[in-house]
């Protein structure tokens, strides 16, 4: 018997002046202590980005929860997403955290900043395998879960925070990792951790975000 249970929380802020968020998080529980979490970032911002990210996260989470392969998910997304008339591409990133029986996590990443994992209150440099599926470079990791592991997935609006204001080149992933590592010992909930991260991004943007920013913590 496995006594681990997952705590999931996420928070987004919109690009300044936009009513809709171009990032989307979808969570699907499959009833056997397995959960699919997808964070997607649609190209650009506003309505089009929102549609792209919502479709992407819904398609992936639903198909994976039904037991279909990652290859089938990626092919379905490529065939389904509306193509941008200006740039000629249908583009949306994704980070997938697939918890299986609350024992292992499959982490699948396409074009988002690499997820941060904190284990034993320290940043853990976890193994990754590079794959190509449907012409997309995808990173996959299979991780045996331990108690108090923390996964932090984010859209690129997080490391872009502070560009040209607080930092010349944004709030880099390593800086975000250090920030999250400093919070780990306090035992905050996933929702609180994701909120603290995104609130810090909002502050670095001067409360006028230049991009949608989303953090999802598991």
List where the protein language model places each region.
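Regulatory cytosolic signal-relay segments
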Residues: 1-20
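Beta-strand-turn-beta hairpins that frame and shape the catalytic cleft
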Residues: 3-6, 31-34, 101-104, 146-148
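Acidic loop->beta-strand submotif enriched in PP2C/PPM serine/threonine phosphatases
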Residues: 18-31, 125-163
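Primarily the active-site beta-strand->alpha-helix module of PP2C/PPM metal-dependent phosphatases
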Residues: 24-80, 144, 152, 164-177
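DG-centered beta-turn motif at the end of beta-strands
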Residues: 41-42, 112, 150-157, 212
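Catalytic core of PPM/PP2C metal-dependent serine/threonine phosphatase domains
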Residues: 51-121, 138-139, 186-218
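A short alpha->loop->secondary-structure connector
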Residues: 117-127, 168
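Juxtadomain coupling helices with adjacent low-complexity linkers
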Residues: 160-200, 204
């Amino acid at each position: 018997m496995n006594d681990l249970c997952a705590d999931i929380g996420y928070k987004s802020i919109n690009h300044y002046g936009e009513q809709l968020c171009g990032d989307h998080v979808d969570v699907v529980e499959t009833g056997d202590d397995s959960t699919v979490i997808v964070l997607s970032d649609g190209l650009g911002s506003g309505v089009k980005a929102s549609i792209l990210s919502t479709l992407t996260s819904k398609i992936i989470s639903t198909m994976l929860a039904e037991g279909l392969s990652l290859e089938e998910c990626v092919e379905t997304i490529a065939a389904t997403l509306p193509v941008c008339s200006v740039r000629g591409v249908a583009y949306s990133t994704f980070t997938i955290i697939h918890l299986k029986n609350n024992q292992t996590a499959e982490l699948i990443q396409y074009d988002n900043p690499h997820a941060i994992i904190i284990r034993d209150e320290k940043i853990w440099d976890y193994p990754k395998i590079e794959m190509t599926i449907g012409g997309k470079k995808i990173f996959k990791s299979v991780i045996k879960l331990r108690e108090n592991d923390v996964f932090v997935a984010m859209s690129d609006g997080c490391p872009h925070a502070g560009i040209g204001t607080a930092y010349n080149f944004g709030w880099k992933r390593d800086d975000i990792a250090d920030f999250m590592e400093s919070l780990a010992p306090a035992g905050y909930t996933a929702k609180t951790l994701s909120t603290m991260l995104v609130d810090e991004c909002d502050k670095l943007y001067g409360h006028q975000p230049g991009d949608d920013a989303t953090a999802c913590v598991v």
